[in-house]
């Protein structure tokens, strides 16, 4: 009788056991601190969908919304939602659960399937700001590949997220979070995780001789390792000095693919028809001859960066000193409020609209303090026009102008290494 009871229990539990033990499972490690309010972008994209998306041709396509229109002279965008969708908790997807926090935008629910976004000023490209996945707290998604099965917190910090596939045959996914990259590496070595990503080539190469490990290398076009230049700091106001920095910068082919400008080649508005600055010390020295002859050039340029880019910063420092500049390098653990040169990673928005980063009125986000009439006009026109072909022309001109003005030097799109079990 007891044997029959055990068999009966196993039969009843088999679906659950199959889910946890028999299905393929991928355990991904991530370094960093995340909460229920700001989970990693990779997780968000797996567990939910946005109202709209922008295709490779720059056209806006519906996802959770089926249509939209403008009212109030373009100051109100009314979105109509699909009425046959459900959250991952099996509850009906309606407008009242949609939470967007957008500057200068008032969100108003009209009915279960209609929502208004009221702007202070008309903005024809507004829908592009609705491409983020819609999430209902905590971590409930809609129309997605995966659902959050469970999660674990420690002092409100995410430690583990378990994802269950919404389609048969897909692997289970588990995300484990670690405070530092060192903790992440140790977790892989101890078998706690099956894969993790890193930008550190030396770290990736340390696993080459591991027989049970495979290393994949890809280019992360969503990031640009960039040298930002304070265009209002001493001799850096002189465009020739900024160009000299570009000409004196080495290639970093071992670290990534050279960047051409502020847009990645994956953007529908990208152009490589821009000025290029290949390493040319003689050209840099000639450009610096007049600026360096002035008394104001005696001060050192402060180059700030973070630990992850210390090696790159050291190479830049050596090259800049070779052409006559004085450089003071400092490794920081915080974002500086003032700098001459700042080397860091930058993630451009998916749409070519970069108004917040380069327009002269954007004091909080235009960290280079660029004040250029042509750039301002191009950025304003790009937000005013909805026609994709016209916008493409505007942003090609924008890229050319930014590269000519050199408020930043765009070094490379980094290689990302995925270390995973075979």
Predicted feature residues:
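Ligand/substrate-recognition segments at binding pockets and active sites
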Residues: 3-7, 289-348
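N-terminal lobe/hinge region of extracytoplasmic solute-binding protein
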Residues: 26-72, 80
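Aromatic- and charge-enriched surface segment that lines or borders ligand/interaction sites
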Residues: 67-106, 187
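Gly/Pro-rich hinge or "lid" segments in bacterial periplasmic/extracellular proteins
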Residues: 119-172, 181-182
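Ligand-site clamp/hinge motif
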Residues: 163-206
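Periplasmic-binding protein-like
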Residues: 232-268, 402-407
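Structural transition elements
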Residues: 247, 257-291, 310
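Extracytoplasmic/peripheral linker and loop segments enriched in polar/acidic and small residues
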Residues: 328-333, 356-421
């Amino acid at each position: 009788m007891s044997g029959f009871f055990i068999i009966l229990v196993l039969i009843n539990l088999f679906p659950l056991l199959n889910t946890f033990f028999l299905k393929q499972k991928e355990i991904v490690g991530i370094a960093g601190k995340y909460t229920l309010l700001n989970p990693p972008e990779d997780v968000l994209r797996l567990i939910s969908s946005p109202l709209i998306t922008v295709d490779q041709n720059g056209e806006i396509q519906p996802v959770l919304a089926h249509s939209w229109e403008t009212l109030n002279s373009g100051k109100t965008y009314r979105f109509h939602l699909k009425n046959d969708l459900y959250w991952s908790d099996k509850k009906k997807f309606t407008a009242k659960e949609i939470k967007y926090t957008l500057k200068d935008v008032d969100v108003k629910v009209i009915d279960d399937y209609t929502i208004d976004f009221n702007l202070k000023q008309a903005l024809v490209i507004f829908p592009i700001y609705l491409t983020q996945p819609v999430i209902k707290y905590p971590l409930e998604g809609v129309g997605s590949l995966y659902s959050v099965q469970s999660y674990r917190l420690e002092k409100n910090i995410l430690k583990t997220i378990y994802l269950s596939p919404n389609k048969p045959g897909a692997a289970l996914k588990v995300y484990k979070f670690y405070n530092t990259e060192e903790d992440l590496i140790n977790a892989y070595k101890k078998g706690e995780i099956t894969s993790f990503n890193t930008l550190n080539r030396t770290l990736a190469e340390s696993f080459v001789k591991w027989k049970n490990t495979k290393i994949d290398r890809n280019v992360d076009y969503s990031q640009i390792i960039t040298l930002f230049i304070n265009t209002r700091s001493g001799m850096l106001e002189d465009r020739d000095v900024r160009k000299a920095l570009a000409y004196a910068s080495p290639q970093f082919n071992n670290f990534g693919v050279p960047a051409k400008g502020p847009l990645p080649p994956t953007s529908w508005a990208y152009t490589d028809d821009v000025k290029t600055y290949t390493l040319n010390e003689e050209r840099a020295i000639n450009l610096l001859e007049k600026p360096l002859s002035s008394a104001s050039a005696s001060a050192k340029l402060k180059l700030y960066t973070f630990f992850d880019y210390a090696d790159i910063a050291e190479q830049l420092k050596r090259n800049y000193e070779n052409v006559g500049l004085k450089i003071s390098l400092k490794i920081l653990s915080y974002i500086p409020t003032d700098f001459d040169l700042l080397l860091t990673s930058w993630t451009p928005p998916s749409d070519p609209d970069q108004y917040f980063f380069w327009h002269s009125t954007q004091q909080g986000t235009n960290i280079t303090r660029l004040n250029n009439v042509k750039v301002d006009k191009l950025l304003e026109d790009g937000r005013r026009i909805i026609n994709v072909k016209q916008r493409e022309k505007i942003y090609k001109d924008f890229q050319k102008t930014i590269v000519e003005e050199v408020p930043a030097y765009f070094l490379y799109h980094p290689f990302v290494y995925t270390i995973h079990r075979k």
